[in-house]
């Protein structure tokens, strides 16, 4: 595994590709006009990045997997994620365009508040967005608008207009992803991630105390699927039943409560939606091999 280069701010990236910094918190770059040849390297950014790949660029390591990015592909990276391939000694001229924006740019804005809604910045949506020619034109228009605003110079309107255009680009990306999910079949992994999000959200409410343990039907309803379809999908992808899959996430949450708090087993059982502590203890031991108290004692 090669070295990972960390770039904490926009200026560092601009310097790396020979781009003038027009704004310390945002940049739009035409990589084909980069004045510097690049080496293959794995990088982690301290800012958000959207890359529009204009030509086939081969396999890139994105998170834990490799993806073959084709022409007209959008790649989204959140701060802290890693992208690139290990250095093979070769230099190349980068192609495509990049939009970079620091979290500080959107802090306190509606976009900053809603960034969690753009799930394609996380591993939850682990496919890049493959654009049609018309969609590519829309994205380029958004990038051009941001670039034009940056070249005007910073004034009191700059932040609002730049952030609005970034938000517009991301909202178009949501629309284009919806189209891709309809036309592409490889969405099962995404649904599994959403099931986990539903379960996580369930335990952040009082539903466990008022309703009880999360059911397969509840998760399916939240994802607008039938319980049978969701059960078949999870069984195909994991080899486990939907109930077993949900229960594994429940056990992870239980472990966090056992090790992260001083609450009694009875209190934790009630918080998780079990009617009886004995039932919780049986389920926990079946999955972990130890009772909750034993697990707390050995950790």
Name each model feature, range by range.
Residues 64-78:
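Short acidic-glycine-tyrosine-enriched beta hairpin
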Residues 163, 185-225, 244-263:
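A short, Lys/Arg-enriched amphipathic alpha-helix from helix-turn-helix/homeodomain DNA-binding modules
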Residues 1-68:
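Generic protein-terminus/edge-of-domain signal
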Residues 281-299:
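…primarily DNA-binding HTH/wHTH and HhH modules…
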Residues 137-197:
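An amphipathic alpha-helical interaction segment
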Residues 236-275, 297-299:
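Terminal helix-turn-helix DNA-binding modules in bacterial transcription factors
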Residues 72, 230, 279-280, 284:
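Short hydrophobic/aromatic patch on the recognition helix
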Residues 88-154:
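A hydrophobic/aromatic-rich effector-binding and dimerization subdomain
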